[in-house]
Amino acid sequence: MKITAIELSIFELPTNTARFDLEEVAYGRRTRWQSRGHGRIDAPIHVLHVLTDAGIEGICTVGDARYQTMRREELEQLRIMAVGHDPFDRERLDAKLRFATRSMFSRPGWHGAFDNCLWDIAGQAAGLPVCQLLGRID
């Protein structure tokens, strides 16, 4: 099996976090800070898709608490370095992308969603949920 394409979908969704200001309010003999809302915001949600020649598509949202998007430069570099490779060779691809991180001036872990997509592909190919591929503690 080979990776044939890597795509990115971008959605604008309302976030759970609203913008706010803090104001001091009297609270007995003391004061305390109270938030005053400034409305909800929409945020981009990036979803990475890794397609294979076997028709299996690995899907994962991008990011964590530190970042929620994939830059165009990272997506293009990922395509150059991963398309045409075996999606089951996760360790080799991870080592290659970790080594490339310094030359790209990208944050460590920028390719984490790609790794999750590879696990999704492996799970679909095996007919198992990813949690069973990873194992569990009894």
Language-model segments: residues:
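Structured beta-strand/loop patches that form or line metal/cofactor-binding pockets in enzymes
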Residues: 1-59, 63
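Solvent-exposed alpha-helices and their adjacent loops that cap or buttress functional pockets
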Residues: 40-41, 136-138
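Metal- or metallocofactor-binding catalytic centers and their adjacent structured scaffolds
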Residues: 51-125, 136
